[in-house]
A protein has these predicted regions:
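Extended ligand-binding groove/face enriched in aromatic
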Residues: 39-150, 154-158
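Structural helix-adjacent loops and short alpha-helical linkers that scaffold large soluble proteins
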Residues: 29-43, 89-105, 147-162, 174, ...
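Structural recognition of the beta-strand scaffold that forms the well-ordered cores
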Residues: 15-24, 82-85, 135, 140-141, ...
Length: 328
């Protein structure tokens, strides 16, 4: 079929990235509640569906961006990293080997995306090795450090720290502690700043502090947290009630990933300023950002509305409510 014709036909199923958000959402619900019905949902529905994206025709095996019964699709390292983190969290929650084996399979794929160009780091896409992105390195550090917590293999701790240091050296904005989006092989930096880039670096720094006791990492995490709060929140005056710091309009899933970093840091330094702000935002969103079907818009002020709702946005909201419910 001609590519122009294909453009006119919508995908029958979700791409891997938004589908993976449902894994994160159900994982968070299960961890928050201990309700076995969520584990059943995860095993019998979410993960069964996820296997439709597993590509074993290329080596090493990894998850492709679209289902394996369609034409072969690209494989993105960051897509796989988010899955690896969730499988590792599921293992830490249960000690069931099936989750660990999946995490290890994904880690092998992630390692295949690293080389010495630019002094290290992981590419963004297996088929387009033209840039190394914060989104394929910062969460890879988180993934490695969680794997170390899971099985105490020191190689993961070493790799997690290496990825953290590489990303900090290559992609941090030294003027404000936030992170740029990517660096191309010619050294050109895309200076866009997204919540899902700085958030995992905050989380990785906090994990490194927890695992090493080195205060340098805690200071890093706190600097990133303050910078994120200043950049990704704005002063907001609601029609009723007191002014508060509102999350900027943008990708809600990016915000959910950033929240993971804030929660990790709060559980370490117990500064609740940022968590309180997230709670205010989520309470306000519940009252002002849902449509008649209960689905959320991306504008947390409630003043603009989306014509279409995205699976990943809804999954991100579930994840954030679940995580905040047990963050005391």
């Amino acid at each position: 079929m001609a590519s122009e014709e294909q453009k006119e036909i919508p995908n029958q199923y979700s791409y891997l990235w938004p589908y993976s958000g449902t894994f994160s959402a159900v994982n968070a619900l299960w961890a928050a509640t201990g309700d076995e019905s969520y584990k059943t949902l995860l095993d019998n529905k979410v993960l069964r569906g996820l296997e439709k994206y597993l590509d074993i025709s290329r080596s090493p095996a990894g998850y492709a961006s679209y289902i394996n019964t369609a034409s072969q699709s690209d494989r993105f390292y960051d897509d796989n990293i988010w899955l690896g983190i969730d499988f590792t969290d599921a293992y830490l929650n249960t000690k069931e080997e099936k989750y660990l084996k999946k995490a290890q399979l994904i880690w092998e794929f992630i390692e295949s995306g690293a080389d010495d160009k630019l002094g290290g780091g992981i590419y963004w896409c297996e088929q387009k090795k033209v840039s190394k992105n914060t989104c394929s390195n910062a969460p890879a550090s988180v993934f490695a450090l969680k794997m170390f917590k899971a099985i105490r293999d020191s190689s993961y701790l070493i790799k997690g720290q290496e990825l953290y240091e590489w990303t900090k050296k290559r992609l941090q904005d030294s003027t404000d502690y936030l992170y740029f989006d990517n660096i191309s092989l010619d050294g050109k930096i895309d200076k866009s700043k997204y919540a899902y880039n700085s958030g995992p670096m905050m989380q990785a720094a906090t994990l490194l502090y927890q695992l090493t006791g080195c205060s340098y990492f805690l200071k890093d995490a706190q600097n990133i947290a303050k910078a994120c709060y200043n950049y990704f929140f704005i002063n907001f005056i609601p029609e009723e009630g007191e002014p508060f710091k509102l999350l900027k309009k943008g990708d809600v899933w990016f915000t959910a990933v950033m929240l993971r970093g804030f929660i990790e840091l709060y559980q370490t330094d117990h500064n609740k300023t940022y968590i309180n702000s997230f709670n205010q935002n989520m309470d306000y969103a519940w009252e002002h950002v849902r449509d008649e079907k209960g689905l959320f818009d991306i504008d947390f002020s409630g003043r603009t509305h989306d014509d279409r709702k995205w699976l990943l946005t809804q999954a991100a909201m579930v994840e954030m409510y679940a995580r905040l419910a047990v963050t005391k």
